[in-house]
Amino acid sequence: MGKDNFVKEITNIEEDFAKWYTDVVRKAELADYTDTKGCIAIRPYGYAIWENIQKYADAKFKEVGVTNLYMPVLIPESMLQKEKDHVEGFAPEVAWVTMGGGEELEERLCIRPTSETMMSTMYAKWVKSWRDLPILGNQWCNVLRWEKETRPFLRSREFLWQEGHTIHETAKEAEERTLMMLDIYADVIENLLAIPVLKGRKTPKEQFAGADSTYTVETLMVDGRALQAGTSHYFGQNFTKPFEIKFQNREGKEEYAYQTSWGISTRLIGAVIMAHGYNRGLKLPPRVAPIQAVLVPIAAHKEGVLEKTSAIYDSLKNKFRMKFDDRDNVSPGFKFNDWEMRGVPVRIEIGPRDLEEGLAVLVRRDTSEKITVKIEDLETEIENLLETIQKDMFNACVERKNNKTTVAYSLEEIEKNLAENQGYVKTMWCGDRACEDKVKEVTGAPSRCMPFEQEHLADTCPICGKKADKMIVWGRQY
C-alpha cells in the first residue's frame, strides 16, 4: 500500500508552494540534488523536456540565419575586465580557477558566467569588412554563477542555456535582431510551453550589465509570482569598442560594429512546472512533453489482452511520443498515479471488454475527463485531443494572467493589490529611479518591464505625482 501511495505524497500547493515545487521536481524524476552544493543533476525525464525546448528553439534560430558554435568555458581575467559595467555586474557571481596541473596559474581564469567577452574577442579576429557581417552565432552550453540561494531549475549555480551573440553593420540592423529574437522566445514559450508572455523593455536599473537596452519575456506562475523567461539585449558599441570589433564599411572607412546577445535557459523547465502546476503533480503541455500518451492495458493477465494492446501500441508509437506500460509488479492504479505525477497529457486504457467492443478510454491529464473512442479512430482522436489540451492549458494561463493583472493609482494601492492578488500591477511611471526603488522597498516587487503594448492609465506617477508618460508593470518574482 505504501508503494501505491508514494506518488501522491506531495505537499499541498496552497500550504507551501516552494515545498510543493521541489516535491514535484524530485517525484516526477526531473532532477535531484547532488553533493555539489547549489548544483542539480538533471534526470533523463527532465533533460528530455530541455531537449524538446532546444529542438524547437534551435530550428527557429536557424530559420533566421543563426548558426551554432562553441566557445571555451574558461575566460582569462584580463578579458573579462575589458568591459567595466559588465564585469562589475557579474563580479559577485564569478567562480575562479587559480590552479592547474598542480601549479598556480599566472592569470586567474573565470568559469563562464556568460560569454560576451569571449565571443567579442573572437569576433574581433573574424571581422575585417562589411562583407563579413552579420555574424549570427549561438552556443548551447553550461554556465556557472555563484548564486547564494538556489532552487532546482529556477536558480542553480550551474545551468544549461543558449546564448546568442550577433555582430551587425548598423545600429538599426542590430536593434531589429534584438527584437526578432525576443519574438522567437515568445513563440517558444507560448506555442511550445503554453504560457502567455508579457513582452517589454527593462528599466535602466533592471537591464543587463553593459547593455544599452534589455528586452524581456515575462511569465506569471500559478501562485502569482513573475518569472523572467528570456531576455534579449542591444549592446550598441559597448562591447565592440573595448574589444576592437571594427570593419571597413562600404565607403572604405573603418568603424565599430553593433552587437546583440540573447538567451533562454533550463529555467524554462521551472516555468512549465509552476505555470501549469496543481496538487496532483506535474502537468505538461503535449508539445513539450517527453511522453505524450501512455497506453495502460487493464487486466493484462487475461488471455489476449497484452498481445492485442501491444499491437495497438505498435500502430501508434511512430505517430506520437508514447509508452506502453506492461509492468506486472504494480497495479493499474499505481500506473495511473505514476504517469499523472510525470504529467503525461493522455492516458489510454484498454481492457478485455474494451477489446471485445472495439473501444478505448482516453483520460486527459489536465482535467481528468474520460473519453470513450473507437480503437480504429485512436490515432485521429489522440491527435485532436493533444491539440485541444495544448490550447486549453494555454487559455487557462491566459485567464489566470488576466485575473491577476490589476491597475493601481497610488503606492498604497500597489501594495494592497500585491498583498491581496499577487500577480502583475500596472501603473504609470515618471521614469525616475527613486520611484522604482521606493516601490521595491515598500512592496518587495521590482519592476517587470515597460510593456510594448502601452496604456495611458493616468497623467501622473503614483509614487511622486510628477508627469508620467510610460506604463510599467510591477510584480514579485522568482
Regions found by a protein language model. Give the residues of each.
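NTP/phosphate- and nucleic-acid-binding module
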Residues: 1-478
